[in-house]
């Protein structure tokens, strides 16, 4: 198994993103980034089967969630309010109608 990294660019917020490559002896290769744990590419016999973009900026501006890793939750949390026990947490409101969508402005997707 070969593992290596390459720079992927800089986000609008000035954070550096990295690509992580994993390749086995058969040539199957996965490419991920630390920007939202996004799957950039998955190749079998030299053919990429993942739909996505070429630049970090494209991933920042997308609305389709290509390559996104679902984490914490998927979908909306109404009005960005999450109750755990007796405590209510106000989350960022990044979706329609003030909902928190897919982890907020910065997250898995």
Regions picked out by a protein language model, each given a short descriptive name:
Residues 1-109:
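Surface-exposed acidic/polar loop and edge beta-strand patches at domain peripheries
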């Amino acid at each position: 198994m070969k593992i290596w990294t390459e720079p992927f660019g800089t986000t609008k917020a000035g954070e550096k993103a990295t690509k992580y490559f994993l390749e086995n002896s058969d040539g199957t290769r996965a490419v991920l980034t630390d920007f939202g744990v996004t799957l950039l590419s998955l190749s079998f016999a030299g053919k990429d089967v993942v739909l996505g973009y070429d630049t970090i900026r494209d991933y920042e501006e997308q609305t389709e969630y290509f390559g996104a890793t679902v984490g914490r939750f998927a979908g909306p949390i109404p009005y960005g309010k999450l109750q755990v026990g007796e405590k209510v947490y106000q989350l960022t409101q990044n979706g329609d109608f003030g909902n928190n969508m897919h982890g907020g402005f910065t997250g898995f997707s």
